Amino acid sequence: FHTVDRQLGNQEIAQRCKLPKSTVSRLTYTLTKIGYLQHIKESSKYRLGTATTLGLGNLMLALLEVRRKALPPMQALADFSRGMVALGMRDGCSMISIENCRSESAPILSLSTGARVPLASTALGRACLAVLPEDERRDLLLRLRQQDEEGWPGLCAGIELGLQQYQEIGCSCSFGDWQKDVNAIAVAFQPGGGLPLMSISCGVPVSHLEPKFLCDEVRPKLIDLVRWLESSLDGSGVEP
């Protein structure tokens, strides 16, 4: 469902989900019974029910609260690092950019809100992989491998390094692995409110700063930012 197609029939849902129509019919019947879908008799189609709408509304409010609280310290860190600080949310095998702040000293860095970036090669994604439960991470790595068998050896090596880095220094790194001219580090957190796992990264142009500056100077501030945000979202945080 989206703004253009507010009503869908079983056949349309089956085509979009690549499921047998009989399976979809059983699912839509059940979802209608529990309030997640509403059946429109005139068109014999379905639209989102009250339970779904309220659930999505609550998720949106939670997401807006994360963005509102994260924005000021993210901008401060972007100015300090002379780079870009991004807030990303995991969605399947990708990360979605939710918010980003850029220093005026880093005009070449750009990441649009809503853009998808890969899990395996970005600091944002590697940080999320590092904090996932082992069984969930194993399943996700299998899906990532199936998406890119040819490039998997290199991707896997980068992921394993990111996991090791997270254990040793509290963040995952991507030094030119996703974008050759950008070095980045990231820390993950669980925002609560029904939202999926998130992470915050700080990226700087390779030509501006060495990885050592990111690890020695930026990393402690990034970790403090994320820990404050996590505690602030449950009401116990003190501004970093």
Residue map of PLM features:
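N-terminal helix-turn-helix
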Residues: 1-64, 227-235
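An N-terminal domain-start capping segment
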Residues: 1-8, 74-97, 224-240
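Amphipathic alpha-helical effector-binding/dimerization core
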Residues: 42, 47-143
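Short, basic/aromatic recognition patches
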Residues: 69-77, 141-187, 232
